[in-house]
Every structure is written in structure tokens, then in C-alpha cells.
Amino acid sequence: MNYGKRLAGIALGAALISGAAVEAAVPQDALVVGGIAYGASESYVRSVYGAPREVETKYNPLYAGGQATEWEYGNDFDIVFVDGAVRQIEISARNGVQTAANIAVGTDVNTLIAAYGQPDVIRGDQYIYFVNGDSSIGFVFEIEANRVDEIKMGVIR
């Protein structure tokens, strides 16, 4: 009987360990692109990057109140704010902007996986990493020819 309990305990432990190893564990404080964290204020972004080249209002039921403000800095670097806080950053060019783990457009997919682990979801050419299992926020890396072609950080649509 004692043997049975040990065997059951070992099996349970192995199942828990293997289940935890499957998910990428991206902590929320890793949601940083170009030195700007998820939730940063408009004033902080302005202090780092200055005034945006263009400002647009976006309408989407996904956003609180149905709208967001997008700041475009040029060179395919855009920041979306909802209620004055960063909710998404998008980079789609080799412009030197990178994540806190040094992943930028042009980075090899193996370097991406070494930095963040296996993605939580692969949807077509997108490698998706959730923050602590929350499928509403994280990173989406678009992969083309085994390289990062686009980075989205924040709200996942």
C-alpha cells in the first residue's frame, strides 16, 4: 500500500512538472519594448521619445470606452494608449527598437525561443506568448523566413 501511494505521488509530480514546462512563462514586467512598459503613461512615453509624428483616434469595442489613441513615431513604431496608459506597442521595421530580452525585428526565431521559450500558441506565422497564462495580454511575434518580422506587445486581439 505504501508503494502505491509513492507511485501515485511520483506520477502526480511528473504530470505537474510536464504541464508547467509546456507554457511559456512571460511575467508582466517583461512586457517592455523600447524601454516602454505595458501600462506606462503618455507623459513617460513623451519624456522618452518626444512628441509623436502623428496621433490618431482608434475605435474598437475591445478598448475601454470603445476608443484608443495611437501615437505614430514613424519607422513603423506605433504606441496605443487607452485612458492614458500604454496598451499596445507595434514594431514592423528594423529600427533598433527591441524588447527587454533584446528581441527586435530581424532576430532569428531560435534566439526568440531561447529568450522566451516555446510559444503558448502558434497561429499561422504568429508566435504568441501570454503573460502568466492570461490570453488577453502578451507578445505576438510574426515570423517570416525564420526571423521576427513584426512585434506586438500588450493587448492581444
Enumerate the language-model features and the residues they cover.
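Short, solvent-exposed aromatic-acidic interface loops
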Residues: 91-95, 152-157
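Second-shell loop/turn segments in exported
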Residues: 29-36, 96-103
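A low-complexity, Ser/Thr/Gly/Pro-enriched, surface-exposed linker/loop concept
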Residues: 85-88, 92-96, 105
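Bacterial N-terminal signal peptides
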Residues: 10-19
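A cross-family detector of function-defining hotspots
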Residues: 26, 42-82, 104-156
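Sec/Tat signal peptide C-region and signal peptidase I cleavage site
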Residues: 20-26
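Bacterial N-terminal signal peptides that target proteins for export
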Residues: 1-10
